[in-house]
């Protein structure tokens, strides 16, 4: 099969194509009929909680590390993962980044409830944040920006840090709370840092449409039409 092309027309990186198939093989990205928290009826659903094995977590960290390096380079010191799903994401990505790029980075996460005893009491766990630290935030998927609204004040209150950006695994490419642009663009406008993703839903469709994963076509023409209809209703209008 010829190399897939990105929406911009350039060849899609191999790790992105692998990650898309990896999500399907790990039962993380599903297609069918789903009702989202927002109430929207969606033909696809992503559950990062389905990454449960050592192999899956190892590979997941590598995909995040590749995407972070592509989008932010080595100009960061800390990976911050908002509780709860962001905690293992920040840990496995820190390990993978060291293995792949030889750079030692620290991990940090927030607590849903502050710890009021012991040496590590407070709102954060993992590494301490220091003035001047450059932080990349790590999440599974951003649909509303709610978790960033909760964790951003904790991070900036801990030290005078620079948020280099946020990385998520999948850009759903749907309108956010404002109903005009994506949740990722809303976060960028509100906080002033870039939001990147390993892959976008457009890239997912491009790779999976009429192609097999584990001997089965994942997105056939009928499902493709349903996805197109979903984005006609909820997608961002260019």
What are these model-derived regions, one by one?
Residues 1-138, 143-238:
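PRPP-associated nucleotide enzymes
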């Amino acid at each position: 099969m010829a190399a897939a092309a990105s929406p911009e027309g350039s060849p899609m990186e191999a790790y992105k194509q692998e990650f898309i198939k990896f999500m399907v093989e790990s039962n993380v990205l599903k297609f069918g009929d789903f009702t989202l928290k927002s109430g929207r009826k969606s033909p696809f659903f992503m559950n990062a909680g389905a990454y449960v094995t050592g192999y899956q977590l190892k590979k997941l960290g590598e995909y995040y590390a590749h995407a972070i390096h592509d989008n932010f380079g080595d100009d960061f010191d800390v990976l911050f993962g908002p509780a709860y799903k962001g905690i293992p994401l920040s840990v496995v990505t820190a390990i993978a980044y060291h293995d792949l790029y030889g750079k030692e980075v620290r991990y940090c996460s927030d607590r849903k409830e502050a710890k009021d005893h012991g040496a590590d009491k407070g709102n954060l766990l993992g590494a301490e944040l220091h003035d001047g630290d450059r932080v990349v935030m790590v999440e599974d998927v951003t649909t509303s920006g709610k978790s960033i609204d909760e964790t951003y004040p904790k991070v900036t209150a801990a030290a005078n840090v620079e948020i280099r950006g946020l990385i998520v695994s999948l850009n759903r490419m749907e309108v956010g709370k404002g109903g005009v642009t994506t949740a990722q663009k809303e976060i960028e406008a509100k906080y002033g840092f870039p939001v990147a993703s390993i892959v976008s839903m457009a890239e997912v469709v491009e790779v999976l449409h009429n192609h097999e994963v584990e001997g089965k076509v994942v997105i056939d023409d009928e499902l493709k039409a349903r996805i197109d209809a979903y984005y006609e209703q909820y997608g961002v209008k260019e």
